[in-house]
Swiss-Prot record:
Molecular function GO labels: ATP binding; DNA binding; helicase activity; hydrolase activity
Enzyme Commission number, as recorded: 3.6.4.-
Name of the protein in question: Early transcription factor 70 kDa subunit
Family, similarity comment: Belongs to the helicase family. VETF subfamily.
GO CC, one annotated term: virion component
Transmembrane regions: none
Organism: Myxoma virus (strain Lausanne)
Assembly with partners or alone: Heterodimer of a 70 kDa and a 82 kDa subunit. Part of the early transcription complex composed of ETF, RAP94, and the DNA-directed RNA polymerase.
Amino acid sequence: MNSAVIELFRHHVNNIPNILPHQLATLDYLVRSIIDENKSVLLFHIMGSGKTIIALLFALVASRFKKVYILVPNINILKIFNYSMDVVINLFNADYILENIFIYSTTSFYSINYNDNVINYNGLSRYNNAIFIIDEAHNIFGNNTGELMTVIKNKNKIPFLLLSGSPITNTPITLSNIISLMSDEEINFGDIIIQGKKVFQILLNEHGVNVLKNILKGRISYYKMPDTDLPGIQYHGKSFLDTRVVYCNMSKLQEKDYINVRKMCNNEMFEKNMNNVSLAVLGQLNLINNLDILFQEQDKELYPNLKINNGVLYGEELVTLNISSKFKYFITKIESLKGKHFIYFSNSTYGGLIIKYIMLSNGYSEYNGSQGTHPKLIHGRPKTFAIVTSKMKASLEDLLVTYNSLANDDGSQIMFLFSSNIMSESYTLKEVRNIWFMTIPDTFSQYNQILGRSIRKFSYKDITQPVNVYLLAAVYSDFNDTIESLDDYSLEEINTLPFDIKKLLYLKFKTKETNRIYSILENISDSYTQPPHPHIVEIVLGEIVRQFFYHHSRIKHNDERLLAAVKSVLTNTEAAKKYIKEIVDGHFFVSNKVFDKSLLYMYNDEIITVPFKLSHEPFVWGVNFRKEYNVVSSP
């Protein structure tokens, strides 16, 4: 990124509508690399740094020269991008051609480029002289979308902007797909890795390090937001390597069925049933391992105090919770905790069923759904929970608007938000005070993404109060090992450990190599010092003006401070004065610390900030802003 751009904003104010300095500095780099040099770029910015805003700023700049295609993982994230586009346009002080920007979910993009599951090669010519932006790029490979991107890259010879906060999802091999999309180099990955017996024993050898540096040099933008303006994180549980884990010792009932299921697994690290019984056991249903039966059984007894009928669980066991050491800990602990909770779990069908009926049986009511038994209250209202899965029919955006609203800062509208993997990417949560992992994530990048979505800058009123993190592991009734090093166990001994502990150790092994590669990517990230690129000068100037008038409500028209600020980019005095006149005559929008939302006006020999607000008469129900006078009202 362009360090000179960051230097322009040493005392940047972030609590107003703005473009952050690192976003402008990265935009400068993208314009130089992708538009000027036609190179592909990996935007490796850690979660919470505003990759979406950077991508959309770049799309608007690039739209003046080329068509821009943006691919996002699903329809819900598509809505987020469309909303964010409106936000970015309001801050964008330059020309753009919105008709040249196309945003698709991967499924809809697939549908317009395939006929009967075969790529329509004749239609790919539409992507000539285009730019592709791919959100969460690490997730598009291994499916038809990844295949299509590779074909477009080879056929159309166009650049890609790949967005990822975690380009290695599982092992270093996953990075190979990103490299292949960014470069024309042919790589034999057998030559650059060391492969052990286990999946986590995949290491980049010395030759691989050199290949990585040579191919990606000049194609990486790395950034991690400073940890300032964030609450502290309080990890709970027993010390476990460099983190903490809550050991949830199983009851004899759970342990018995857990062991029986484990004996049935051929490769337990890849079988959902081990995740299931680590969360909770459901008797014979776990042995059958067929989730469809969950919704077919009629009054089937699972345990003496637990039955299932047409997908509904009922019985005293949902309160005593011998079926789940994790939920026994969770239900007991939440009684004493304040604020909102975010709870991650996997296997949405199995997990969603268990969560719903345990919560209802323990007095927590379903948001817009069933009321809990003897409902627990907050401010006279039921304490509610919501379960988010990829299958949910209701609008996820509406649910998150309620969860993130100021009125819900204390959790009085939705206190508990349970979610499967869908929430690990692209969504933002606010005022989360308690984060729970009911299932061990498949990768530590997923674990970090969930933390990143939940603990965000500018999302907390009070950063002096810590955020609690609970990583729960189901362990045997007599297990209490303290694990301080990855060398504490041999591979054979690891296989005898509780499944959750074994999975955590595997993830830590893989994370060690992932962090080594991330360090390499960080070191080859491009950094330089130059004046802002001509294509982004107006955008940079707009942010300079916004920052200046946050502090100043009224100045002389020839104020030297404003002139100096503008001349930091426009070195010519006459050009700077002309620019100032244009923004005042055009009533530039700013946010002032006294008047809030304001427009610039000339009054006698002064430039003043004039507050405004949009209002309407009660009978007005629609306004078409494309016509000067077109107010639709009732008779």
